[in-house]
Amino acid sequence: MKKSIVNDIGLYKTRLLSMLTEDSDICGLLLNKEDFTEAEANGLPYSQIFPYLYINTQAETKTCLCFEVDVPQIPTGMIKDMKITAWAYSPFDQMPYEKEGFLGTRPDILADMIERKLHASSQFGIGQLRLESVTSSVLDSRFYGRQMVFTVPDFKTKG
């Protein structure tokens, strides 16, 4: 089967979901405990880690991590630009969080953990992901967080 440019959106999302659920610091922050089971970590996708922007306004409010992958431009016949946008957000009543080696509010610390994890990865594109921006975001009247944008060039199609 011939590969498509859009196929890498799903590939990046699959890799991100796997990487983020395997990180003990990220899972500990989301689960709000240091000691958690593998089953609890495996339960995070689609409950607190989403491969799309999602704000659950109906259920219990929890800290969440969302991400989206885009192809903003295809500058040459061989290379395309990939963009990963990540949102780390918490309810206003869950802002305090402490973890050795990290500073800030819960969304700040989660954003820092995400950046450290992605910066160390070589699973995306050609070279390292480049952090383009980190901005604050009020997602609705109950949630505050950070939006991060990463970019990396990648081959137009693979295979």
Question: What is each model feature region?
Answer:
Residues Q73-I79, L139-F143:
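Short, solvent-exposed beta-strand/turn "edge" segments of beta-rich domains on protein surfaces
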Residues M1-T76:
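Small/polar-rich, solvent-exposed N-terminal microdomains that initiate assembly or binding
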Residues D70-P72, W87-P91, T151-F155:
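Solvent-exposed residues in well-ordered beta-strands and their adjoining turns
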Residues K3-S4, M95-T105:
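Short, flexible/disordered intra-domain loops and linkers
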Residues L65, M82-I84, R146-M148:
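Hydrophobic residues positioned within well-ordered beta-strands of beta-sheet architectures
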Residues G28, G104-G159:
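Acidic-leaning, charged glycine-interspersed low-complexity segments
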Residues P75, F92-P96, K156-K158:
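Residue-level signal for secondary-structure boundary sites
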Residues D81-E98:
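Short acidic, glycine/tyrosine-flanked loop/strand segments centered on an H-E-D-like triad
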